[in-house]
Amino acid sequence: MATTARRIWRAVVAERSMAPTLEPGDTLLLLPAGPHGLPWLRGAPRVGSIVVAEREGRLDVKRVAAWPVDTLQTPDALWLLGDNAAASNDSRHGGPVPLNALRGILLFRTGPSGRRGRVS
């Protein structure tokens, strides 16, 4: 993964936690979000968005499953899940992720197999 900046940044998927949506080797273009991001992206992203968050000293790619106001008791936190539950260390194991851990929102994906475009 890459480090964040105040412009579009790039990261490469290293694990299968988001398969089949994202595969190892896919390159992601991300908009900076969270406290380090663009002013209009500092709040919680939409449910269903794919985001990068910093957890336990590493950057993880996950999908937003719930906002703080949806079903969580923890304000200012997101419930993040991997699409591949069997290979994902996500909120099912570690609980909600603080909004200030958010680093980016997926804008575009390119892949070694020619897969490219927006991801939903």
What positions do the PLM features span?
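Extended hydrophobic leader/signal-anchor segments used for secretion and membrane insertion
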Residues: 1-120
